[in-house]
Regions:
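Alpha-helical bilayer-embedded segments of polytopic membrane proteins, i.e.
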Residues: 2-48, 63-89, 93-107, 199-242, ...
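Membrane-helix interface/capping segments
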Residues: 47-61, 252
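Short alpha-helical catalytic segment bearing the HExxH-like zincin motif
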Residues: 108-112, 229, 279, 283, ...
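Cytosolic/stromal cytosol-facing helical appendages immediately following the last transmembrane segment
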Residues: 2-20, 122-125, 129-130, 134-201, ...
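Intramembrane catalytic core of multi-pass membrane enzymes that act on lipidic substrates
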Residues: 55-176
Length: 351
């Protein structure tokens, strides 16, 4: 029997279904829908945070919620296909607007749920995660995130962790290039360790699939289909990397006397406990608990007393795009955390 508090996660299906409807009305309608949804979620987060109740620590995960994510994976492929059909004969402006609307969903939700499924021990779920990331032409995330970002988050060694004073626009080229390079280095190292050839590499095959899909789309739908797919992928990746920028901005793990990094703690990620955006994003904003317990299902994540964002991700994406505004909001929070909240919160989180 589903727990009442978990029924809010049914909102996960709202965005792709609404996007499917709006794609059928053309690029302008799809773009207006996207802006409207973004504004509503950002506004609700800002003016009615509606803080969630954390589940009791001993609560068992709800298996049906994994099914919701699996259904979403199917919906995303259908949404991209619908967008391709609409874009093939559309004006170039409509191609761009359709790609932006679809990329909003595949980035805000698709990559978020690929991330959740990729943390699963289920082969099916990990396969769906690879499918979702390949559908936005970013399969190397599946290597870099789990083998690179998680061990190195909140350090200067991690290209996906933003440094204090680093603007989003300086961060983006660094993380895009660094994550791609490190993913292939990690994959090569693992293949050597396992004494396997590149023919066994899912990263290689997924990357070849991106090339194959590109060629097939060009042959089937011409330049418009190809541009649509790559543009929606670019929008999705931009959303992903902007969220990465937000999640660990300015937070650093100390280097211990032996040269090792201190363990990841509650103070090494920014959090936002907003009920609407967390319902749409599978509790991704409870980011400290996620990093401290990476295999935890999203519905069991706790709201820990770590550093708090000024609003949810929907609003922070806009704030981060304006560096002076972002720095003005975040640097006092960094200083406040360093001045005393960190020690108190880390004691509480370990009780």
């Amino acid at each position: 029997m589903p727990r009442t508090r978990d029924l809010r996660f049914l909102l996960i299906g709202f965005l792709p279904l609404l996007a499917l409807l709006n794609v059928s009305f053309g690029g302008v309608a799809a773009a207006l829908w996207t802006v409207g949804i973004w504004a509503v979620v950002a506004g609700v987060d800002a003016f009615w945070p509606g803080a969630q109740r954390s589940p009791p620590p001993a609560d068992a995960p709800q298996g049906w919620l994994v099914g919701v994510l699996r259904v979403y994976a199917v919906l995303q492929i259908v949404l991209i296909a619908a967008g391709l059909l609409a874009a093939r004969d559309a004006r170039w402006l409509d191609v761009a607007l359709l790609a932006g609307a679809v990329g909003f969903v595949t980035g805000a939700q698709g990559i978020t749920f690929a991330h959740e499924l990729g943390h699963s021990r289920s082969r099916l779920d990990r396969a769906l995660a690879w499918l979702l990331m390949t559908s936005v032409a970013y399969p190397h995330f599946m290597v870099e995130h789990y083998r690179g970002h998680h061990p190195r988050a909140a350090t200067h060694d991690d290209p996906a962790s933003a440094r204090r004073g680093e603007s989003l626009w300086r961060f983006l080229p660094r993380t895009l290039a660094g994550s791609l390079r490190h993913a292939w280095q990690l994959e090569a190292a693992q293949l050597r360790q396992l004494q396997r050839g590149w023919a066994t590499s899912p990263l290689l095959w997924s990357s070849l699939a991106v090339v194959g899909v590109s060629a097939a789309l060009l042959a089937w739908g011409g330049a418009r289909a190809l541009v649509f797919w790559w543009l929606q992928s670019a929008v999705a990746v931009l959303l992903l990397e902007t969220v990465n920028y937000i999640e660990h901005y300015g937070l650093q793990r100390a280097t211990l006397p032996g040269g090792q990094r201190e363990p990841f703690a509650v103070g090494h990620a920014w959090n936002a406990d907003h009920v609407v955006s967390n319902s749409l994003l599978a509790n991704l904003q409870r980011h400290s608990d996620h990093h401290m317990h990476a295999w935890k299902p999203f519905d069991t994540l706790q709201a820990l007393p770590g550093p708090q964002l000024p609003t949810g991700y929907a609003g922070c994406l806009l704030l981060a795009a304006v560096p002076p505004l972002w720095f003005g909001l975040m640097h006092p929070r960094l200083e406040e955390w360093s001045a005393g909240e960190r020690g108190e919160a880390e004691v509480l989180s370990n009780l």
